[in-house]
Amino acid sequence: DGVLLAGLNREEELLPRFVHAHDGMMNTGPMGYGGKGFFVHRPLKKVTIKMETPVIYFYSDEPFKASVEVGFNGGSINQWYPQRSGGETVPKIVKPNPVPTDAQFKDAGGIDFSTSFNGQIKWDVDVLAPDASRGLSFKNGETLNWLRPRNSKANVLKVGEEYEDYLFYRGVGNFELPVTFRVDPSETLHIENTGKEALPFLFVQEVTPDRKIRFHSFSDGLPAGSSLSIPEKDLHTTDAKWRRLVYDQMVQGLLSTGLTSEEAHGMIQTWWHSYFEQPGLRVFWVVPTDKTNEILPLTVSPAPEKTVRVLVGRSEVLRPRFEQQLVEAYKVRKEKKKSAAWALNMFHRYGLAFQERVQTLSGEKIAKK
């Protein structure tokens, strides 16, 4: 119905151990370090937006020192690398409790993102010469998805005693988007650009439960104030070569927004497993530049000759028949007198968000998020 669901407290791709984070917001979860989700240590409420993989590259013919500041209006920059030089402060955890009562929420260091929260991070960076060794960035414990964004010709960066080919940050928050997505009872997807700028590029992809792949690319984007409707039958069903088709069309869409070839390929490869191979209906859309600057204001000193910012949104959309499956599964658990919490709560990446939707559809209170 176009409403953003809360409960996005799950991390879909694990980070290496060397990534820095706020206390209680490390890359961990119910099965210990490296599990998916940090909610065990710091309770979070009303997380409707995840900022998953932003990186900042520098391209320079000469070495120089730079100061970089990124704000996050509506959210917390909770994970980063290299170590930051400054930034936001989050509440201190006095009494850690995975499931605090409302009275304990504050002492547990909880953050309610339905109230105003504006994050910020700063780095004092040494941009090294173009011929600096790429080996400087090597670290034990690097994951494949950490390596893929290095697919660029950017300068190696040094912050303190840490080296990397890019500045990395992640966040969680709650704010309105300039676009809405809904699916009507006929399973037609409706996309409306409610913002003041055109969406430069959109790509709709669906992986069905029986692993059929359907997609549609909108290379011309979506003008401000306009909408489009996509009946389920109009999503193109592909054959065994779908990966090449989807990959190439996504790369072309990103190239048209200003990314270099290396950056575009690195971005798609970083996302591939957790986004393009997973079941579900999703829409990729390039955020308009002014909206990007509004949400994530960026200041670099000295000012660069040119700045290119490409932020890609990914919206997971629930079809009515899938929602009905959630409700039916919940009813079965109730009949068997099992926990009222949704079965996938502890393990599925959208388990908490599914709980909220089931609660709305069934009229029952299930759990706090």
Regions found by a protein language model. Give the residues of each.
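Protease-labile, long low-complexity intrinsically disordered regions enriched in Pro/Ser/Thr
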Residues: 1-369
